[in-house]
Amino acid sequence: MTAFDVLVIGSGAAGLTTALALAEKKKVLVVAKGSLTGGSTAWAQGGIAAVLDAGDTFQNHINDTMTAGAGLNRLETVKFVIENAPRSIERLVELGVPFNKDEDTLHLTREGGHSHRRIVHVNDATGWAVQDALLKSAGDNPNITMLSGRSCIDFITDRHGEKFSGRGRVWGVYALNEKTGEVEKHVARATVLAAGGAGRCYRFSTAPRGATGDGIAMAWRAGCRVSNMEMMQFHPTCLYNLDVKNFLITEAVRGEGGQLLHPDTGDRCRVDYEPKRMELAPRDGVARASEEQIKRYG
């Protein structure tokens, strides 16, 4: 059993960017459920929002975000994310993400809830390009070890009778080796949880099949404060067909003029809900309206 400085649970954008930052001075282990590309990051299509247009401002983006969140957002967090987004895009470019360009500048598209064009993208497969670049960088880093096929079961704490110093501390994770069926113990001085969400707890979802909330449950059992679990995001549009696997229809389709039509009349559904922004309203409102239309008309 090798002890690492830091254990990162999850190999998506959050986990790998954390690992790359920490690996400048620390030995890092990344463990992933299923394949290293099996999380939500690789599934993302549309792109990443950042204030990059000369006619846009951070305040515009902040206002749009607070409106989309119905004012429930934590303002300081919103400001931090938005003000650091341009630098994060630059970092992804440095790591090799081939964002689409319009001559010498990044090409910006538009998505729902945004008052300006802010979305940098790699065609319609942005998430896969980001995942690929991060995995290559992590794979080339001698301070990062990555293990796939590890389903994490529980954090290592004094609850399990482990004799590490520091009551209430987390010292790593117990993980099921999906190939051998054995439970492994991965020990680290610090543990970062980046295991994704719980979208697959619902019958209909565009989330990856591994998004079953394992990490959230582990955190709760270890004594972490878990909040805002009712804030589950649903993507407003996906292809539904009983003969094939359903798949997400990217937000960018509506951002570039795609319309949601009534199946019988052919009229635009959104006119009855938000006639000003129509299909470009924030995701929550569009998803609620889509659900109502499906329940009403099948």
Please provide the spans of the model-predicted regions:
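Conserved redox-cofactor binding core of oxidoreductases
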Residues: V93-E182, A194, C238-N241, F247
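N-terminal Rossmann-like FAD-binding beta1-loop-alpha1 element of flavoenzymes
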Residues: V6-V30
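An anion/pyrophosphate-binding glycine-rich loop and adjacent beta-alpha core
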Residues: L36, M218, C224-G298
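Glycine-rich FAD pyrophosphate-binding loop
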Residues: A23-I48, A54
